[in-house]
Design a protein with these regions (language model features):
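Short coil/turn connectors at secondary-structure junctions
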Residues: 6, 15-19, 24, 40-42, ...
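Generic secondary-structure signature for well-ordered alpha-helical cores
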Residues: 13-14, 34-38, 57-61, 70-78, ...
């Protein structure tokens, strides 16, 4: 919204303090969340500009590849769009088809800039290269649109979501398939998953020892405390041992 500085301050002033901020956004949203982390919590991932990686082969529909690519590119000029294939012929046809389809796209300026700045075509030569490339990219969205998806599916460990087969376009997951769409970007799928209920729960450790329990393990803990020259720790443990 075109608010001036004073209006923005008024909006923030009237907002209640929160303990956690979650949700996707562009590069500015992701940057803002990073700056407030520590004062509040954020989800354990980077939910920044959108990404798609498409795995295609000689039997993949050219139209499906191109439309999935521009469907991601039109999100944001910072969107990342990657095609991975072994098929040189598909690459040649894809480049031409992409150019044609971009001409009629209402958001063609955004999509064109996205593809120019962040688009990539990876020509690979074997399945090992495919698997390694995907796991290294760790895309937010992965479309596996090949004739035999089973040989890849269980070897992909780093991806926010995986759309399998020709009838599972990424764009559908934006709206109607029911899976969570707040997903890790910027390769953060290597260490995190999509937003889930677990992000809204905290865990508290509860420790309860019996007299017998503290006597059994206290000796070991005391040795460690004394080794670290933490006399107070050792005294605290000893005060509970052999106490009548």
């Amino acid at each position: 919204h075109p608010l001036n500085r004073r209006q923005r301050q008024m909006c923030i002033r009237d907002s209640q303090k929160v303990n956690k901020i979650v949700g996707p956004g562009n590069i500015f949203v992701a940057g803002a969340k990073r700056q407030v982390f520590g004062d509040v919590g954020i989800e354990g991932m980077i939910a920044g500009p959108s990404e798609i990686t498409i795995l295609a082969d000689s039997k993949t529909s050219l139209n499906e590849v191109t439309t999935s690519m521009i469907g991601q590119a039109e999100h944001d000029s910072n969107s990342q769009c990657i095609l991975i294939t072994k098929n040189s012929n598909l690459i040649k046809k894809f480049k031409k088809d992409l150019e044609l389809k971009l001409k009629d796209l209402p958001r063609k300026n955004i999509a064109s800039k996205s593809i120019k700045n962040n688009g990539l075509i990876l020509k690979v030569y074997n399945d090992r290269q495919i698997i390694d490339a995907i796991n290294e990219i760790a895309p937010e969205h992965l479309e596996i649109n090949v004739s035999n998806y089973k040989k890849y599916k269980d070897k992909i460990f780093n991806a926010g979501s995986i759309c399998i087969g020709k009838y599972s376009p990424m764009a559908l997951s934006d709206y109607a398939v029911g899976t969570n769409h707040v997903l890790p970007t910027n390769a953060s799928a290597k260490f995190s998953s999509g937003l889930s209920l677990s992000e809204f729960y905290k865990k508290i450790s509860l420790i309860t020892l019996s007299k017998k329990g503290v006597e059994k393990i206290g000796e070991y803990a005391t040795h460690l405390a004394e080794y670290e020259e933490l006399k107070g720790h050792a005294l605290s443990i000893k005060s509970r041992i052999n106490k009548e």
